[in-house]
Amino acid sequence: MTLSIIIVNYNVKYFVEQCLISIYRSQGVDLNEIEVFVVDNLSKDNSAAYLKKQFPITRYPHIHILTNKRNVGFGRANNQAIRKANGKYILFLNPDTLLTEHTLRDILSATNELTNMGVAGVKMIHTDGSFAMESRRGVPSPWVSFCKMAGLNSLFPKSKIFGKYYMRYLSTEKVSPIDIISGAFMLTSAEALKKVGMFDETFFMYGEDIDLSFRFLKAGYSNYYIPTPLLHYKGESTKKNSYHYVHVFYEAMLIFFKKHYKHYNFILSFPIKLAIILRAIMALIVQQTQNLHKFLRPRNGKMPKRMLYIGKSSDMVKQIAEEYGLSIDYLSANETSLPKGHHSLTTSPTYYSQIIYDISDFSIGFILDRFEEKPYKQVQIGTFNAERGIIITNNNIYFKD
C-alpha cells in the first residue's frame, strides 16, 4: 500500500463525503494503492452510518470507518488509525478540505525529490481564493510567539526576524523548507513517523501538528512546503472567534511551551495566560458587537446577496433553491464552453456572494485556479454535487430531500 489517508471527523459528515469524493477523483495515482481511515469522534449528526451508506465497503473496500464511544480528540483519533495503517506514506487530512485532481500526484512525486523529509504540506487556499498563511509557519519559539502576539509579524511580514511565524518572506510558488506543517494536510512516511513517534495525546484539539512538526525538526528531519493547491474551508468544525477556540488554542500553546521550552516555563506562563484572557475578551466583544449590529440593523426587507450556479444541472439546483428560499442565477456551462469560468461574466463577480460550480462539469483544479487567479474577499467558492444533490458553501449546506 502506497498511501494511508487519515481523516478525523466530528459532526461534518457532508464535508467528509465531499473530501472522500475528491480523493477518489485523483489522477496520476493508483487508487488501489490508497486506503482511507475516517475516525468518527462520537458525532451527533449520524456521520458513521451516513458515510457507510454513501461509501459501501463492497464498492469502496479501502475506506474504513472507525467509531469512538467518546470524543477522544484529534491526536488520539489519528493515533488509532496510524496503528492500523499499512501505507508507505501517511497523510493526515482535515475533513473540511477539497483536493484537486492532481494534489496527491504532486505531493507524492515531490517526495522523491525532497532530502530527508520529515513532513510535507501544501498551498492551502481559502474559500475566497486567497492564500492561507498557515500553509507555512515557523516554530512558535518565545520570540516568534511574542512577535505574533505583539503584532510585529503583521507590521513586518517580510522580515525574517519579526515575520517568521507565517514566513511570508518565502515564495508561495516554490518548494521551500519550512518549520511547521498544518495538520489540515500533513504528509509523512511511516518509517519516519515510527522513529519520531505519533501525536502527543496531551493535546486535545490544537497544537498537535505544531508539536509533531517540531519533533521531526529536532530529530534531524526537514519539513517542506509544496505549492500544489488545496481548498481548506477552515472553521466548519470550530468557530475561530469563539471564546472556546481562543481558550483551547492558547492552552495548547502553553502545553507546547512547557514541553519544549521548560527553562522558559515560569516566564512564559503568565503572558500566555494573559493572552488567553485578552483574546477571549476581544472575541466576546466582537461577538456581542456583531449581535448588536444584527439587532439594530435587521435584514428584513433587504434583498439577500445572490448566488450564481454554473453547470448543467440547473433543474435540480432550482428545486433546492425553492426549498431553502435561495436567490440563485443560473449559467449553463462546463470547462469547454467557459474556459475562464466566472471571470467571463459580463457583470462583476462581486455581484454574487457565492459562485457555485457543478463538480460534475468542472474539475476541482479548474475551480481553484479560477478563484486563486483573482480572489474577491466577498465572493466565496460553492460546489454542487449532482449525484448527491448537495450544495456546499463556506457557511451552509443545502441538499435535496
Q: For the regions a protein language model found, what residue spans apply to each?
A:
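Short, well-formed alpha-helical segments that are part of the catalytic scaffolds
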Residues: 7, 12-27, 320-321, 342-343
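Short aromatic/hydrophobic "clamp" motif used to bind/position activated sugar donors
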Residues: 90
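Short, flexible, basic/aromatic active-site loop/helix in glycosyltransferases
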Residues: 139-178
